[in-house]
Amino acid sequence: MNQPQVQQYDIVVIGGGIIGSSVAYHVLARDPAARVCVVEPDPSYEFASALRSSGGCRVQFTCPENIAMSLYSLDVIKNFENTMAANGRPAPVDWVQGGYLFLVPPERVAMLERNVARQQAMGCQVDLLTPAELKARFPSIHVDDLGAGAHTPQDGWCDPNGLLWGFRRKAVELGAVYLKDRVVAADVTPARARRVTLESGAQLDAEAFVNAAGAWSGQVAELFGMHLPVVPMRRFEHYFTCGNPIEPLPYVKDLSRLAFRSEGRGFSGGLVNGDESRGFNFDVDHDYFENVVWPAVAHRFPPLEAAKCHRTWSGLYEQNELDGNPVIGAWNARLKNLYTVAGFSGHGMMHAPAAGRGIAELLVHGAFQSLDLSKLGYERVQASQPYREEGIL
């Protein structure tokens, strides 16, 4: 019986979506000689979380690491078309600098003030607005139950498909090998990961392995004997229009998890149910908009009472059940050459450039260089010590 041929690489990235492709690109940009293999079971990316998202990118976080990652990612995305051109082909991402608007009730104003102060201290352009100032800036908004809002005009949104394929094409141009396959087993020693076996029967040896499998990363971690509290959580996105006139709106978010933005002649958004059952479920509830989202958008912006939903689709959050923040780093307590970059809980697209850079620095240089992401490491999972955002969803 023929033994499967073992292929040798320096780095095997498990998951070739927006995070894994960012990792591959950033590694090869730093070490052109690196042998990088990316294993992706579905190159159509039909169920990839990023491609089913709204593409938002914003600095409105409270953890300094997330703010700093957003600042870097915004810079990358705004210049992406030219800097990530591959083989003479531009990499358009259709960036729209429409801004973000976070809204809070009166009892959460102090929290928002703290958040804004931290963001401003890190160089973010943030306007803290009273209800009257909100009404002056956005005349259609209902403010009677609001305490304040934070507006970041430099934020916006882009095309996630363009971002993913831009990273992938550039990584391939630099030498990355993409395999259409699935990792089904891992061979480990007490201190290191040694080999992975693919669904096709092929085997890959590597000096380092990166788990960038998104909503599937918890399952991948189990193959290595690692517990990673990242699970899939279904969410809905809706495209809706409104015949009533309304001023241009930024990306609007509030503490109920309502989130929507302009999209062409209409709007794209939804309202995430944090109590949604975990699991790989892509079924669509076609009544969700009318029952949940429409009342929320109509309450906040009364002209949207005439909103009509044209399409609803589902996607998955790679939800970190510990604290909602990503896990970025190596499993230093055991398999020191197994790296995780997963659990972004809805923030993966916007942080893909910075997270990919961070993992690449660990792989190539052995330490974070541009931005210290140590607090987002796996150690907090092992210690059951959450590192949460305050009032940011």
Positions of PLM-derived features:
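Active-site substrate-recognition segment that forms the wall
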Residues: Y25-R30, A50, G55-R58, N82-G99, ...
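Dinucleotide-binding Rossmann-like beta1-alpha1 core, especially the glycine-rich loop
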Residues: G55-R137, R257-A259, R278, V297-A298
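C-terminal catalytic lobe of FAD-dependent flavoproteins
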Residues: A298-L393
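Beta1/beta-strand and adjacent pyrophosphate-binding region of the FAD-binding site
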Residues: Q5-I19, C37
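Glycine-rich FAD pyrophosphate-binding loop
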Residues: L28-A50
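Core beta-strand elements of the Rossmann-like FAD/NAD(P) dinucleotide-binding domain
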Residues: V6-Y9, L198-A208
